[in-house]
């Protein structure tokens, strides 16, 4: 009780309640700090008596909220009665984060309904702290009430959709803003914030609304947007206006410096024959263009192992990642020797991490002895995450059909990784590999897991 707790820290009030359940205070003429302790007492009779004295102590309202969900009926009803009497709009704004947090527990709906009902009469200015609260549940609650009560203009809703990081708030506000201007007009007030938003959901909503606003021509520049959902919406609007997105994509990809999003867009709506426009771009000076070209070739299912192999050593992580994804279905056609060389380079001077990760992913996809060999090799990698990944692969490894029984390399590799196994599991793995000198198999009475 030496530390002051404010309304803005809902978790602190719950922790206080949990910490003080066993304090032996009796509620008779208590001062405010002592009364707070009594309100958290384990005995329901003491909590009920403390509630009688809590009237007039605004600072203790968070604890009253807590006891609105008390398991003792008398305590619960008295707390709800006090909360009804004490809550006004300012108090409801202050208590909303705690109410929503505690409302996730059983019997928490009462406080949510009460605070929500009071907030419906609040002004937009009183909502401001809730609109920017760090807890997304609070922001969702506040924006939902504001939309239902019509507290925000279409422009304010559009700016909220563009600003908020939560997808639920983005969708809620964008849809409400567009629904409002569909009835009243004034699209410009809504379109500018949405089209300029950082988040793709808001931009996609704005692009889709261009058709209703009679501004179809503006959708063309969003055909090369960095987001796939925005590009899809832009293609729809352009087609509705009589345009041909595919022709535009083809023209842009023939340019000397195409927009990366246009490269992806060509693959999204193009044909396999359009791969001829993408292959030259895998050697483009821009890493983003190279990566998008590789992703487009994968999407069009036009993969050439020989032409893509050099890109596994690209200095840009995004390019190596796309090349790896494209080659994974054909991992069996990728020579494992050069890939292993990228895992065993001398440290600290060796291949970059993203190159080693790409090589390991392809070797892991090969399975069998190749997978085990690669996984044991990266146990000595300087990158901790890659070492952990390798250890997990080793521990899950089992001999596969088609492997040669009794392969001495398997025994040598498992021996290097013996610190990852118990003696029993190591013995079992070696037996599975058919190595000589090990038991013919665990007995049926063995209680160890396989």
Region roles according to the model:
Residues 402-450:
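Eukaryotic acidic, Ser/Thr-rich intrinsically disordered low-complexity regions
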Residues 49, 60-62, 66-67, 73, ...:
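Extended alpha-helical scaffolding segments
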Residues 34-39, 63-71, 94-105, 126-134, ...:
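Alpha-solenoid HEAT/Armadillo-like helical repeat scaffolds in large eukaryotic proteins
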Residues 57-61, 123-124, 154-155, 187-188, ...:
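Core helices of alpha-solenoid repeat scaffolds
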